[in-house]
Amino acid sequence: MQFNYTIRNPQMLRTFLQEQGYSKNTISAIKHNGALIVNGQTETVRKQLQKDDKVEVHLAQETASHNLIPFEKTLNILYEDEYLLIVSKEAYQNCAPSREHKHFSLAEQILGYFKQSRQNIVPHIVTRIDRNTSGIVVVAKHGFLHHLMANIHIDKTYLCVCFGEMKAHGIIDAPIARDPASIITRQVNPHGKQAITKYRRLDYISNYSLCEITLLTGRTHQIRVHFQHIGHPIVGDDLYGGGHSCYKHQLLRCFKISFMHPILSLIHI
């Protein structure tokens, strides 16, 4: 992957790269397995740049972890360019391999797609969602882009079906911490990290509410913990009090997302 720049002010190449968001690790990788080219000549980070110099940054080629075993299965692709891939994930699928589910993750499915489409790329999941939550996932096509995305605010909107009749709208402001009795679950705790969830009820039928949810913070299991906390657990979420005989996963979906693309323009899906 290559990025091109025109220099506006004299400065050292290393300084310029740092200003563009290249981390020390990325710069080190470029030195060993990439290239820095100024006006057609290969240079080092100590090169003194002048106004109007043309700089090419060739990122280091990445190698996928041996733990990622690619497999081919049709992806639900919502958006793709040379920098990012945005897909819709099914429920019952991890974003990345875990101790309990070592293979058939979304990352491995995407790696299979890249190989099938002859893209020598390692996927970097930007917006992870829980195994049994479905919906939109953003993927960076290089670690550098993943690094840039870490500093970009992403607006995510979810849909869920929960038990009981929710109020027409509201905000749940309750801090969340790890459950000391579990390595998986979280709980509302006054000593936890701030967590704020905004919701709007869209429909109510037969003791079930359909809600649209916006996260103002991004804690692990935030929606699930908050809805349990107010007495309206998500249908199918047996981990947080919403077990249901007809649904074996929580009825929770990330269905809308928007953010400023790190290279191009606004993305809204």
What are these regions (language model features)?
Residues M1-I267:
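RNA pseudouridine synthases
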